[in-house]
Regions:
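Long C-terminal interaction/binding lobes of large macromolecular proteins
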Residues: 60
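Vicinal oxygen chelate
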Residues: 1, 8-17, 68-115, 119-121
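Conserved beta-strand in the GNAT
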Residues: 52-54
Length: 121
């Protein structure tokens, strides 16, 4: 089906969330973190739970992963089977997201970030 979402590390969550909401018109889906200190902000520009998620922290700005949305759960299973057959390292094996109920898995790629294959949610 296409690109589902992108997750990036962004040390300045406030400035980044402001960019996406005020300039690009995204809406905040949720904010997560302990004791009122945001560690992650999920934003959307369509009916999905999140189109982009921003993870805070002191590390460098970089892509954590992007998600490719499949047409069916069978497509997710087939992609996982192929990844395992060719020896692609699994970053996160098959499971369901708590926030959007997406069924997915994450694989490593040569660019040093993960690619998530998912369906539903």
């Amino acid at each position: 089906m296409g690109l589902g979402h992108l997750v990036v590390y962004q040390p300045d969550l406030d400035a980044s969330a402001k960019f996406y909401t005020e300039l690009l018109g995204f809406r905040v889906s949720d904010v997560a973190g302990p004791l009122g200190r945001p560690m992650a902000v999920s934003l959307h520009c369509n009916p999905r739970h999140h189109s982009i998620a921003l993870f805070g922290g002191s590390g460098p700005r970089r892509i954590n992963h992007f998600m490719l949305e499949c047409n069916s759960l069978d497509d997710v299973g087939s992609a996982r089977d192929i990844a395992r057959q060719v020896g692609t390292p699994m970053v996160i094996d098959l499971g369901r997201h708590m926030n959007d109920h997406m069924v997915s898995f994450h694989v490593a790629n040569p660019s040093q970030f993960a690619i998530e294959y998912g369906w539903g949610g």
